[in-house]
Amino acid sequence: MTEISAKKVKVSALCELCHARKAVMKRPKNLQKLCKDCFYKVFETEIHNTIVDAKLFSPGDKVAIGASGGKDSTVLASVLKTLNERYDYGLILVLLSIDEGIKGYRDDSLATVKRNQVQYEMPLEIISYRDLYNWTMDEIVSCAGIRSSCTYCGVLRRQALDRGAAKLGINHVVTGHNADDMAETVLMNLLRGDTARLEKSCAIITQSAGSPIKRSKPFKYTYQKEIVLYAHYKKLDYFSTECTYAPEAFRGTARELLKSLESIRPSCIMDIIYSGEHLVLAPKKKKITTSYKTNKKKTHTENEVNADGSVSLGRKKQFEDGNRCEKCGYLSSNRICKACMLLAGLEMNRAKVSIDNNTAVDGAAVLTRTLEQLSF
């Protein structure tokens, strides 16, 4: 968790907007000196402009706020409630929280979400990994290893948000992803050479394949430091402990790089987002295949577990949007959705561990060799 505090300015300095009250902070985005009231106004107005420019909402929309109890989602709930009343958006706002099953972290943060429910007078729905997948993140990490935690959690959490929204009859979920998160994602995809994801890194509205539920980011252009300052000055109730498994995430590498760049050039966060928005990748070259390759049938049709725990299903024809996963029945553009692929890998690995531990010495080596291809 990055600790952020307002930089002290001279007592004699006046707010650069109202020129009447003393400035209490410098905006990290442009170093503008502002008083509290002007900061609130600028902060909220910029988010309103983002919402209007991107046409995120329509009157009467029922919107689920992805609530974790952290600073981003807490400020998002507070600001959306304020803007909804000020500009008469006509939205019906609901808090949607995901319980991943991380002891000592999520149980405490959910207590904060429940307080937010009362403070903001919004309905709250909690969806748990245990109920949806029969796994908790603690169990997944014990089986797949801590380095894979974010891979699993990202896929499962996105589907859990979709499922929670569908349960509530909602087709729009807003999340607290901020400008820092967007810039980090661009850097991560550049560092990994992930051109497929790089093209979509800065989309303000996203949607899972086959799902009618869209996810949007009203904080796309809002600096994390300003979100923390807003929460601090408004005295909002939020949970500040970092996820237990976050230190192992590759995102941390991009975050440290971004901090170094920001110390040299404060505008680099917006610059990176701008670059991501306007990046045009060269068109992919079409592969020329011979009739032999085209007609060649794949003889090995068994499911294979990949390094990240997902299951490869061979070269099957992809489903169209609107079809459903053959395993869980949820909307998917493939025969088996990503969540079920990951869970299948976990079940296979757990079966291997169980056999290794319980099989008698005679025959154990044969069974182990047979199932070895299923391990991560």
UniProtKB/Swiss-Prot annotation:
Family per similarity comment: Belongs to the TtcA family. CTU1/NCS6/ATPBD3 subfamily.
Its job: Plays a central role in 2-thiolation of mcm(5)S(2)U at tRNA wobble positions of tRNA(Lys), tRNA(Glu) and tRNA(Gln). Directly binds tRNAs and probably acts by catalyzing adenylation of tRNAs, an intermediate required for 2-thiolation. It is unclear whether it acts as a sulfurtransferase that transfers sulfur from thiocarboxylated URM1 onto the uridine of tRNAs at wobble position. Prior mcm(5) tRNA modification by the elongator complex is required for 2-thiolation. May also be involved in protein urmylation.
One GO MF term: nucleotidyltransferase activity
Keyword check for Cytoplasm: yes
Leading EC class: transferase
Entry EC number(s): 2.7.7.-
Subcellular location field: Cytoplasm
Main localization of the protein described in the UniProt heading: cytoplasm
GO BP field: protein urmylation; tRNA thio-modification; tRNA wobble position uridine thiolation; tRNA wobble uridine modification
Key word RNA-binding present: yes
Pathway(s) annotated for this protein in UniProt: tRNA modification; 5-methoxycarbonylmethyl-2-thiouridine-tRNA biosynthesis
This protein's name: Cytoplasmic tRNA 2-thiolation protein 1
